[in-house]
């Protein structure tokens, strides 16, 4: 997978979202789940006033289809109030990947997919809950995109939203293989 000189991922479908500002330095890759149905439904939501500026650079559907919404040199509203390795407000210095996944909403997961649910406790605390599983095709696509981004932009870390905003976010959650993704990108262990 290659990234073009104008910061687009070759081979990805494009659905341009307006907005954002120039991002001169990219330091981190942040992985999220959409808390929703399909990748397209999330993109459609981001186009509404109710989204309040929420967006991400990449959305990956359960079948592994990759959609890019903004070039990687433009900010997106994916991190919100966040902090990591001395940086605050990570929208200004991170690339966001959203994975179509219901997270810990088992009713939504059962309505949109027949994927298994994992019963687990989140690493940041809370009760044992049911989490939607991530399909192999989606994990593989995420890994390919992440490796290309880390290589192209020499990113400092790959983290979950749950790592940069632990008191308010729980994505991508315990069913996502974060350690495997990080190791594929050249980082050791968990964030």
Where are these regions (language model features)?
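Aromatic-lined carbohydrate-binding surfaces of glycoside hydrolases
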Residues: 171
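Intrinsically disordered, low-complexity regions enriched for glutamine and histidine
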Residues: 30, 159, 177-180
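Active-site-adjacent loop/helix surface patches within enzyme catalytic domains
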Residues: 2-156
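Acidic, His- and aromatic-enriched active-site or binding-groove loops in soluble protein domains
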Residues: 2, 6, 21, 59, ...
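Acidic/histidine-rich, metal-coordinating catalytic segments
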Residues: 153-168
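Short, electropositive, low-hydrophobicity segments enriched in small/polar residues
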Residues: 100, 164, 177
